[in-house]
Amino acid sequence: TRVYAAKLATITETFIGNALQQLQFSAGVQGRQLSDAVALQVETDRVLAQSMAFNSTFVIDADGTLLSVSPAPLRHLVGGRMRSPGVDEALHLRRALVSTPYVSAANNLVVTLSQPIIDKQGRYLGYVGGTLYLRERNILNSLLGEHFYKDGSYLYVVDHQRRLLYHPDNQRVGTVVQGNALIDQLPTLPSGTVALTN
């Protein structure tokens, strides 16, 4: 179980690294066409369709205005000023980022991966982002969710604030875990496994 958990952690890190690379490439493309709404949308659609790594993809300018978004049902938000912890974090930090979980403008619990858009003069123009809807199907939760053990054990993922990012019981995703001996020990554990009875 320990070896398998370590392998899943490595696969997850690789997935996030690859997703950030896709966004970095797109940020370079989008930086050359910010004034062309059609070209922006085509590239935003391409990133979503390319690998199915994200549930949605988008471009936000330096003022927080949504310039393009995919899939199509979210396009009614284009032109609006986006206000959320994830947007604020990306606009403030202006670097490659995996956000803390937050509720999006479309009312989804999400984690956003983002890459800044920087022009040739080094000016920050905004960012390209991709979201993982934590309560809906995506590649990451498919990977984690397909692995139950015959003995009834399972895995779950928590962030540094004790919020469940993945759990086999989808209703628990987004909740904060209290009174859990394993999670209480996490800050003191370098790595490894802990036997715990649920």
Question: What name fits each language-model region?
Answer:
Residues 50-53, 57, 62-133, 137-139, ...:
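Extracytoplasmic/periplasmic ligand-binding sensor regions of membrane-associated signaling proteins
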Residues 1-38, 46-53:
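Juxtamembrane extracytoplasmic/periplasmic/luminal helical "stalk" adjacent to the first N-terminal
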Residues 36-53, 73, 83, 123, ...:
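Solvent-exposed, extracytoplasmic
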Residues 2, 20, 24, 41-45, ...:
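Extracytoplasmic/secreted envelope proteins and their assembly/folding machinery
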